[in-house]
Amino acid sequence: MLPAPGNGSIHLMPDKKKRHVFDKGHRRKFLVVVDETPECESALAFAASRANRTNGALALLYVVEPGDFQHWLGVEEIAREEGINKARAVFRLFGRKLKSMGFEKLDAEEIIREGKIDEEIVKIIEEDEDIAIMVLGASKDPSGPGPLVTALAAGKMVGEFPIPITIVPGDLGQDEIKDIA
């Protein structure tokens, strides 16, 4: 988790950059962190519907988190390659899902990062000034909405996150999502 500012702690939230989504040559991107959870499909459906209706695009982010193998160089490299291959497989899966939802012509940038997920999300938002909205899916699990929703939308970062976060309830069907997006 990111430390709170002040009292000698490191403040990881950089100054917010101006978004350029309406400038000539730019268009709004909806950021979706992709994984294999059911709620991710809800986020994808909402983001794709919004991007399609507003002439936007998708930025699909997969983060390969570091393992505990850093002292075993060969094992770390194998784990890294497996993570990248898994990311590519997830992108293929979500490409098929977008096509089945009728969004095959929607621009979807595929981004693979290595590191801690919350830090990589902030980095990609700061690097790409066209990313204007992050879309997360909330889990239907009674234990909570999921670790990413909890960390980003209800955690210490929420008041200073660089862009708005849209949270899609996990119990909405794709038709309901398309209707409200």
What are these regions (language model features)?
Residues A59-L61, E109-R113, T166-V168:
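General small-molecule cofactor/ligand-binding pocket signal
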Residues V75-A79, E127-D128, L152:
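Short, hinge-like loop/turn segments at secondary-structure boundaries
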Residues A48, K123, G155:
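Active-site phosphate/pyrophosphate- and oxyanion-stabilizing loops and adjacent acidic/basic residues
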Residues A4, G8, D15-H20, Y62-A89, ...:
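Acidic, proline/glycine-rich short linear motifs
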Residues A79-D107:
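Helix-adjacent hinge/juxtasegments
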Residues I133-G159, G173-K178:
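Glycine-rich, Arg-bearing micro-motifs that act as flexible, cationic patches
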Residues L2-G25, K99-M134, L172-E176, A181:
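Structural beta-alpha unit
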Residues H20-G74, E160, A181:
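Small/aliphatic-rich secondary-structure junction motif
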